[in-house]
């Protein structure tokens, strides 16, 4: 089979105006970026949000990620194509924008694979419509303005060593995790320690993805916690007056981007916070617009149900015009065998015992989603090396738990690789059985929220806190911020905070190292284990395989 980029480059794209027309968007509603992508303008956004139509929302999540691959984005796109082209339903796919840094590192892109991709894949994975660059500029402008305030005046007496804002770059660069700025003479600024986070891990990315409009964006930026004064008082961006300028930098990036799949299903691709260190979902602007424009909306949550899935149900859905009508859990035979074996060496060999053992991981993810009182289905992403016996066994194991399972081949066959699965998903979404039950109550304090997520979703025995975390929790209580939702930063590879504990581990405690207020995003990040907000590059970065010819044709992107 040809590479993803070869398949994408051979596909004849439809003009973006034709894609828009499928969901009743007119030419004047668009701000085109070339022939194949466009932003939806504010006039259209404001008009669409006033209509009463609300489609069905289908959330796609998965088992715990493994090096064997799960293909969640591929399934989301293929399922959307199947609903649109095989069942002939009005459908929109809402996905996150990929971060450029990991494209050159290890993870790869987020545009699907094989015959189930969104296009133009090179643009989406690299510069796209410039949203990531706008975010990076906004992040670093804010950092520069704060440093300049301290250098020029500092009438609020901000402590340079207690600035909480990080600089940003959409590049994997471990050397920037800890730096010192303002070195040398005072002419270069006030010397203090600082750090970079990858753009998508910055609070401004979360704010962009949660804001409803420019006024909300501006208010949230103003509420961002800059740091503390020498006498322990919190300082917010609005006290310094920078929110208008930063919102101006992001006003265009706030508008969702319209593209298409290989099979010309409309897709909104907008925003991209990581799910292990942020909330892991595309913008609420895009999802809400999709709900008002189409009958069925497919969106995905980053990583497994314990990370993106939990955050979507308990946090993101509170910002949407409706909660999910159905949940899809993506699984593969290979990934479940990896959960049992802990190695990729023999995944191509039939191993029913390993599959039975690894199934415990899927079972927990299924039950996690079921605990939210939303109908659940499992889609098994078939690989060429899967045997019929393995697929039959996995289907049987799932259905013994009272949940339907369907084998799909969207990667190899596009929308034709799972029409029956698409119908089953539609049946669930139309069943009217979804009535979301949250993991915690909104008025629970920080520790109660953490404990409920840890015990109900991760299946931990309890929670342990460092002295530093205890002090930070007291600080948040002191400034009245201890009732906000919590976003737990945790490894994606395990239900625990130890990435080596595969399968469905028990007998462990969750170890909380620290908590930090993201006041503009209106949540508290709870740090566990060793989670980095600035990735590094591997020994053999994907960049070594990427090239471009003299005609501008890119190769090596997956």
Curated annotation (Swiss-Prot):
<comment type="similarity">
    <text>Belongs to the formate--tetrahydrofolate ligase family.</text>
</comment>
<dbReference type="GO" id="GO:0004329">
    <property type="term" value="F:formate-tetrahydrofolate ligase activity"/>
</dbReference>
<keyword id="KW-0547">Nucleotide-binding</keyword>
<feature type="binding site">
    <location>
        <begin position="66"/>
        <end position="73"/>
    </location>
    <ligand>
        <name>ATP</name>
    </ligand>
</feature>
<dbReference type="Pfam" id="PF01268">
    <property type="entry name" value="FTHFS"/>
</dbReference>
<dbReference type="InterPro" id="IPR027417">
    <property type="entry name" value="P-loop_NTPase"/>
</dbReference>
<comment type="pathway">
    <text>One-carbon metabolism; tetrahydrofolate interconversion.</text>
</comment>
<dbReference type="GO" id="GO:0005524">
    <property type="term" value="F:ATP binding"/>
</dbReference>
<protein>
    <recommendedName>
        <fullName>Formate--tetrahydrofolate ligase 1</fullName>
        <ecNumber>6.3.4.3</ecNumber>
    </recommendedName>
</protein>
<dbReference type="GO" id="GO:0035999">
    <property type="term" value="P:tetrahydrofolate interconversion"/>
</dbReference>
<keyword id="KW-0067">ATP-binding</keyword>
<keyword id="KW-0554">One-carbon metabolism</keyword>
<dbReference type="InterPro" id="IPR000559">
    <property type="entry name" value="Formate_THF_ligase"/>
</dbReference>
<keyword id="KW-0436">Ligase</keyword>
<dbReference type="InterPro" id="IPR020628">
    <property type="entry name" value="Formate_THF_ligase_CS"/>
</dbReference>
